[in-house]
């Protein structure tokens, strides 16, 4: 089976010394960097571009060599660089959740005066089961009214199962205690929510989720006449027939929603983040036949990324990049810390947080960076060599997304240590309906910017 982690794949890394990193293979493309280097020392904001000779825009060709390509071009009208005047290498370690952290998050999110309880998936309380029975009973009534015999049969069967479970269910939930559990129930305002924590003893897996409880009862949180189910999601992925001119009924503005989300993350001990995406929150209502009966905008969905000295690291989905090796012994992987928050008129109602890393406090400040002149020289020497060995279905490549940013890489010399390092990204996003989705490039190379 092809071993490739598609979620946030790592492509080519061309650097002044080594270049390509897969989890199980390493291929070197020597870049001599025979020109002079610039020191990215302290200075005024914006001095980084001046010191390294980085233009605001660039259009030019890269040699094709023996790659078989007809052309390799760079064409970007707005080259992106950090607003700071220097860059660093910052060390992080793989994150895990101890009991104290879970307690901190639960007490920050839930109303402590109403109690915080352990949720046991295998031993639910009578109130847990009754909530589910109530939800399925409502679905059953809708199914009967609409003549949906299939849904009616399913609801009857599942309600019967839940009623049988009631026989051995406990009357009361168990308190959170020492917070050694992984799932907790608590109140936000008048509604119950669940917080679920997960991490991994090996690799990177620390994450927690906040969701309405029970999830199938979300229609009780936001009822609508004739609707049995409701789902809330990013309006960008709504059907084409959704009326985009609908007003957003959220009592918060978009900026206020972003601030609420940042306050939520800060209360969970997550401060070094930067907003990377915001969209309207679309609520879609369905009847028992899963036909849409209504839609509305109420709130916003926001994604934050790790902030590295005020810069959001590169985290595009590179699954469309066909020059990645498909060898069985190569696994491309990278670390993408994302924090997605939903806010409606009641505040934060859903969160999916991946604080995969924790800072170690170690930082190499003011690292020396490759000049733009040396970078172009390195590209002309090594990009043809890369495409000679790693074939693509494209005949012509045009990098239209050029940026100097940070990228997270594993420090192979230390156990469980990761580094955010300065890199150049040269990526190509194809045009679709007059727009370019730079989060899903079709070509990409990465150049370590260190001398």
Give the residues covered by each predicted segment.
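A short, surface-exposed interaction/processing loop segment used at functional sites
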Residues: 208-242, 249, 336-341, 345-367, ...
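Segments that shape or occlude catalytic/ligand-binding pockets
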Residues: 258-420, 428-432
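Short, small-residue-biased leader/transition segments that mark boundaries at the very start
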Residues: 1-6
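C-terminal soluble interaction/assembly domains
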Residues: 413-423, 429-451
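Bacterial N-terminal signal peptides
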Residues: 9-17
């Amino acid at each position: 089976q092809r071993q490739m982690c598609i979620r946030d794949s790592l492509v080519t890394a061309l650097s002044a010394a080594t270049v390509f990193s897969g989890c199980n293979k390493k291929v070197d493309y020597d870049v001599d960097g025979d020109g002079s280097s610039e020191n990215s020392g302290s200075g005024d904001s914006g001095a980084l571009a001046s010191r390294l000779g980085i233009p605001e825009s660039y259009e030019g060709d890269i040699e094709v060599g023996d790659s078989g390509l007809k052309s390799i071009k760079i064409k970007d009208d707005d080259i992106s660089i950090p607003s700071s005047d220097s860059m660093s290498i910052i060390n992080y370690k793989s994150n895990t959740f101890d009991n104290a952290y879970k307690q901190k998050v639960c007490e920050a999110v839930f109303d402590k005066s109403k109690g915080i309880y352990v949720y046991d998936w295998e031993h639910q309380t009578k109130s847990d089961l009754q909530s589910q029975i109530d939800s399925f009973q409502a679905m059953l009534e809708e199914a009967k009214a609409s003549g949906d015999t299939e849904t009616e049969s399913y609801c009857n069967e599942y309600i019967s199962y839940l009623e049988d479970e009631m026989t051995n269910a406990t009357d009361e939930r168990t308190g959170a205690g020492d917070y050694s559990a992984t799932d907790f129930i608590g109140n936000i305002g008048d509604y119950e929510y669940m917080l679920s924590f997960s991490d991994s003893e090996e690799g990177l897996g620390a994450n927690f989720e906040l969701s309405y409880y029970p999830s199938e009862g979300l229609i009780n949180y936001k009822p609508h006449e004739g609707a049995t189910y409701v789902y809330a999601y990013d309006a960008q992925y709504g059907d084409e027939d959704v009326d985009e001119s609908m007003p957003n009924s959220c009592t918060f503005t978009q900026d206020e929603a972003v601030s609420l989300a940042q306050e939520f993350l800060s209360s969970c001990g997550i401060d070094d983040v930067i907003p990377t995406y915001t969209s309207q929150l679309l609520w879609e209502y369905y009847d028992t036949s899963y036909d849409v009966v209504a839609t509305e905008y109420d709130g916003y969905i926001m994604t934050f990324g790790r902030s590295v000295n005020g810069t959001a690291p590169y985290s595009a989905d590179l699954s469309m990049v066909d020059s990645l090796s498909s060898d069985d012994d190569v696994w491309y992987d990278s670390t993408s810390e994302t924090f997605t928050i939903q806010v409606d008129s009641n505040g934060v109602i859903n969160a999916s947080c991946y604080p995969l890393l924790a800072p170690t406090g170690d930082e190499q400040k003011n690292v020396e960076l490759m000049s733009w002149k040396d970078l172009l020289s390195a590209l002309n020497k090594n990009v043809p060599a890369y495409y000679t060995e790693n074939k693509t279905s494209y005949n012509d490549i045009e990098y239209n997304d050029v940026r100097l940013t940070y990228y997270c890489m594993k420090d192979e010399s230390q156990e469980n240590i990761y580094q955010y390092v300065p890199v150049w990204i040269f990526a190509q996003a194809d045009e679709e309906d007059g727009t370019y989705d730079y989060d899903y490039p079709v070509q990409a190379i990465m150049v370590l910017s260190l001398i």
